[in-house]
């Protein structure tokens, strides 16, 4: 039992020392997923003047009082 646990630990730790398991590749995969999500969101976003629940739903920058608004209106709204 101890041998199998030790063997599994070695298999998990060994790539860290050999450089096969690089955090950079994991980060680039995460960035790629976030970019795909952002592009998908832009493709299926809510137009200006339509109802919205959050700013993520809007094609532009923000959702003010349940309506998608243009970026310039968002800046004015945030200043108030």
UniProtKB/Swiss-Prot annotation:
Covalent S-S links between cysteines: 45-59, 52-63, 58-68, 62-74
GO CC, any one term: extracellular region
Coiled-coil spans in chain: none
Endpoints of the signal sequence: 1-19
UniProt entry keywords in alphabetical sequence: Cleavage on pair of basic residues, Disulfide bond, Neurotoxin, Secreted, Signal, Toxin
Tissues/organs with expression: Expressed by the venom duct.
Annotated GO MF terms: toxin activity
Transmembrane segments: none
Localization (cell): Secreted
Statement: the UniProt record of this protein carries the keyword ATP-binding: no
Chain residues in the propeptide: 20-41
Domain notes: The cysteine framework is XI (C-C-CC-CC-C-C).
Similarity annotation: Belongs to the conotoxin I1 superfamily.
Full protein name: Conotoxin Cl11.2
